[in-house]
């Protein structure tokens, strides 16, 4: 077993590196646990088999090359594992995750295990096409520059008829929002079949565009029970002239997501990604996967927007960590910085960026903080923060747009929003 623990190993530029937070069972030394993680997530199995002799395990095995105790925690360690590039199929997030996190989390020697970060080398990231369009192309399509974009999730999320749904969309867009959004739970239920919804929403889009002179969008949720149906919905959205569709990438799966991203790239649709189910995976501090890994894999799989939490009203430490994965979504090159939870330097080599979407419990009073924290390249999404306005949807949308324009102008004139 311990041949998988190799502290003298020098990592290669082409290795995929992983940082695992391990909690070994009592009595299991951390080196043994680290070796077990490296073995089980690469070439090893529970015993030595004679067919090991038919290949060069030295060439293909994962190696645990460093272990450090976690500050302030008893019996928790960060194990660093290096995987040779040949273990993974090119351009497949599905295969990457199946290999690295597929089996090892049920391991008996471990009480808990969490994948904190992955370093994706350029040699591997270059096999992915990434986001269908990216931040710059999206701005050019929408002709909107120099400010964050505004969105709104239509509420109540379930129960509206297609016609009333379209009316709510129209009021929000007419009031000044850039986007409205299907809730992630809206697919094609008996009271709101997808085709009816798409038609009424398209009508709302074009009416509000004609009246405001701005390009408008609505994230039409194309998520479906199977891939063919999903693509069919995306095709219909494109035929209606909608600029953007949406996908729930964790419940839909990475294979479906990459398929949809390919379609969107080839047909000029933007792709909005919702992270429904993420907390099942990333909520526990000592088990599962950190959201920054889900964010990195999404950037590879493909999406132009992804929900990334809000920061506002959370603890200060959370803020730095959230900004860490916001940078991982947007920037080309991100330096290692443990205070922000970034375990490895990540070089995306000009893969297009993803716009982080701030949504969940935010309203106009948060606007100065949000513009300060997220900057221009983001989507600020107010659901109840728009629709909860005492005068209705359109005035709620106006309030958001006015607040945003005021904050952006104040910032451009040199005022310190954070201090104020």
Swiss-Prot record:
Record's keyword annotation contains Ubl conjugation: no
Compartments where found: Plastid, Chloroplast
Site label Transition state stabilizer, positions: 314
Comment on bound cofactor: Binds 1 Mg(2+) ion per subunit.
EC number, UniProt record: 4.1.1.39
Active-site residues (renumbered): 155 (proton acceptor), 274 (proton acceptor)
In-chain residues carrying the UniProt-annotated modification N6-carboxylysine: 181
Main location: plastid
Entry binding sites for Mg(2+): 181, 183-184
Gene Ontology molecular function terms on file: magnesium ion binding; monooxygenase activity; ribulose-bisphosphate carboxylase activity
Keywords: Calvin cycle, Carbon dioxide fixation, Chloroplast, Disulfide bond, Lyase, Magnesium, Metal-binding, Monooxygenase, Oxidoreductase, Photorespiration, Photosynthesis, Plastid
PTM section of the record: The disulfide bond which can form in the large chain dimeric partners within the hexadecamer appears to be associated with oxidative stress and protein turnover.
UniProt: substrate binding residues: 103, 153, 157, 275, 307, 359
Needed cofactors: Mg(2+)
InterPro entries in alphabetical order: RuBisCO, RuBisCo_large_chain_AS, RuBisCO_lsu_C, RuBisCO_lsu_C_sf, RuBisCO_lsu_fd_N, RuBisCO_lsu_N_sf, RuBisCO_lsuI
One Gene Ontology term, aspect cellular component: chloroplast
EC class of the enzyme, as a word: lyase
Pfam (any one): RuBisCO_large_N
Disulfide bond found in the keyword field: yes
Reaction equation(s) it catalyzes: 2 (2R)-3-phosphoglycerate + 2 H(+) = D-ribulose 1,5-bisphosphate + CO2 + H2O; D-ribulose 1,5-bisphosphate + O2 = 2-phosphoglycolate + (2R)-3-phosphoglycerate + 2 H(+)
Protein task: RuBisCO catalyzes two reactions: the carboxylation of D-ribulose 1,5-bisphosphate, the primary event in carbon dioxide fixation, as well as the oxidative fragmentation of the pentose substrate in the photorespiration process. Both reactions occur simultaneously and in competition at the same active site.
PANTHER family associated with the record: RIBULOSE BISPHOSPHATE CARBOXYLASE (PTHR42704), RIBULOSE BISPHOSPHATE CARBOXYLASE LARGE CHAIN (PTHR42704:SF17)
Subunit field text: Heterohexadecamer of 8 large chains and 8 small chains; disulfide-linked. The disulfide link is formed within the large subunit homodimers.
Other remarks on this protein: The basic functional RuBisCO is composed of a large chain homodimer in a 'head-to-tail' conformation. In form I RuBisCO this homodimer is arranged in a barrel-like tetramer with the small subunits forming a tetrameric 'cap' on each end of the 'barrel'.
Name assigned to this protein: Ribulose bisphosphate carboxylase large chain
Organism: Anemia mexicana (Mexican fern)
């Amino acid at each position: 077993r311990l041949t998988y623990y190799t502290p003298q190993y020098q990592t290669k530029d082409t290795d995929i590196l992983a940082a695992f937070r391990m909690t070994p069972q009592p009595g299991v030394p951390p080196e043994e646990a680290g070796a077990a993680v490296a073995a089980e997530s690469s070439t090893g199995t529970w015993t030595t088999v004679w067919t090991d002799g038919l290949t060069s395990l030295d060439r293909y095995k994962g190696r645990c090359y460093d272990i450090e105790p976690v500050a302030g925690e008893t019996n928790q360690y960060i194990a660093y594992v290096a995987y040779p590039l040949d273990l993974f199929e090119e351009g497949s997030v599905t295969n990457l995750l199946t290999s690295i996190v597929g089996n090892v989390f049920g391991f008996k020697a471990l009480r808990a295990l969490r994948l904190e970060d992955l370093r994706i080398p350029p040699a591997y990231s270059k096999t992915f096409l990434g986001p269908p369009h990216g931040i710059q192309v999206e701005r050019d399509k929408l002709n909107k520059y120099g400010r964050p974009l505004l969105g709104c999730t239509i509420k109540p999320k379930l129960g509206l008829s297609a016609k009333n749904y379209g009316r709510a969309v129209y009021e929000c867009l007419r009031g000044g929002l850039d986007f409205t959004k299907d809730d992630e739970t809206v697919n094609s239920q008996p009271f709101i079949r997808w085709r009816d919804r798409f038609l009424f929403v398209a009508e709302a889009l074009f009416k509000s565009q004609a009246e405001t002179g701005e390009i408008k969008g609505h994230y039409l949720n194309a998520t479906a029970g199977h891939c063919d149906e999903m693509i069919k919905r995306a095709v219909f959205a494109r035929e209606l002239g909608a600029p953007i569709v949406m996908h729930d990438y964790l419940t839909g799966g990475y294979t479906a997501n990459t398929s949809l991203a390919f379609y969107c790239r080839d047909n000029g649709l933007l792709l909005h990604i919702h992270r429904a189910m993420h907390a099942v995976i990333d909520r526990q501090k000592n088990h599962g996967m950190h959201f920054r890994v889900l964010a990195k894999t999404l950037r590879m799989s493909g999406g132009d927007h992804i929900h990334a939490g809000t920061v506002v009203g959370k603890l200060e430490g959370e803020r730095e960590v959230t900004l860490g994965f916001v940078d991982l979504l947007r920037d080309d090159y991100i330096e290692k910085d443990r205070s922000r939870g970034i375990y490895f330097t990540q070089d995306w080599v000009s893969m297009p960026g993803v716009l982080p979407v701030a949504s969940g419990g935010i309203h106009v009073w948060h606007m100065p903080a949000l513009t300060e924290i997220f900057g221009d390249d983001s989507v600020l999404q107010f659901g109840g923060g728009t629709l909860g306005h005492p005068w209705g949807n359109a005035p709620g949308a106006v309030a958001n747009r006015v607040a945003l324009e005021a904050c952006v102008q104040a910032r451009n004139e040199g005022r310190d929003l954070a201090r104020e």
